[in-house]
């Protein structure tokens, strides 16, 4: 085996420090010259991660090839908590941030719509009010979801208690919601972007809320 002398160990220790400082210097110089590099931890809610981020991350990677992006997927509440705890660099969520000390910016506006199976009683409606939805089976997102937070607030705003809805189950992803709704068990409320493929195939029907629900 090979072992270092005390002098060799001292030289190795300083060499490691020099290399570490060199890496840090590269990063700092890159920041000063506007060149981004290094790891980037991005947190995103389920809907955003599955249906909106893939194209954006591809474009980002092409613009900043020196940045190694890593995506963490969870519901909006969990992502917000991770940003507050500094375990991720940036979070993309569907509802306004609630914790103080966090800086938030609106990236885009999204419309939420009712979806149901083509043979479900709601399917032929041109639009539907929050009050009318009390008469139908509801497939909901789970607590902590940005979509759940927004829809609960929407119902309350229009004098419908979320607890009064005929909630059949609470599910943790848009894909799970679409799968259950397509069987005719009830309706769900999801981002318009989530159901493009199913609408084209005729597997689901999309109905605007009245008044519209945007976020």
Regions found by a protein language model. Give the residues of each.
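Alpha-helical "hinge/linker" immediately C-terminal to small N-terminal DNA-binding modules
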Residues: 3-34
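Hydrophobic residues within well-ordered alpha-helices
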Residues: 5-8, 42, 83-84, 133, ...
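Short beta-strand and adjacent tight-turn residues that come in two discontinuous sequence segments
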Residues: 21, 74, 88-94, 172, ...
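Central regulatory/effector-binding core of bacterial HTH transcription factors
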Residues: 35-100
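A local structural motif
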Residues: 63-71, 159-168
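Alpha-to-beta junction loops
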Residues: 67, 79, 84-93, 112, ...
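Beta-alpha-beta core module
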Residues: 99-106, 110, 125, 132, ...
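Secondary-structure junction motif
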Residues: 122, 138-159
């Amino acid at each position: 085996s090979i072992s270092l002398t005390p002098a060799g160990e001292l030289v190795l220790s300083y060499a490691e420090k020099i290399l570490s400082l060199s890496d840090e210097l590269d990063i700092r110089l890159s920041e000063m010259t506007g060149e981004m590099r290094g790891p980037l931890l991005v947190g995103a809610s389920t809907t955003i991660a599955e249906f909106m981020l893939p194209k954006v991350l591809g474009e980002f990677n092409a613009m900043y090839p020196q940045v190694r992006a890593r995506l963490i997927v969870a519901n909006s509440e969990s992502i917000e908590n991770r940003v507050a705890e500094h375990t991720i660099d940036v979070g993309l969520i569907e509802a306004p941030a609630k914790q103080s000390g966090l800086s938030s910016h609106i990236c885009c506006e999204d419309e939420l719509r009712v979806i149901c199976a083509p043979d479900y009683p709601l399917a032929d409606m041109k639009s539907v009010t929050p009050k009318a939805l009390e008469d139908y089976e509801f497939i909901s997102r789970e607590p902590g979801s940005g979509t759940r937070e927004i829809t609960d607030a929407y119902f309350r705003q229009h004098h419908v208690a979320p607890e009064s809805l005929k909630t059949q189950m609470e599910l943790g992803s848009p894909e799970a919601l679409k799968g259950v709704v397509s069987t005719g068990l009830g309706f769900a409320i999801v981002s318009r972007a989530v159901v493009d493929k199913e609408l084209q195939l005729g597997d689901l029907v999309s109905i605007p809320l009245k008044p519209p629900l945007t976020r």
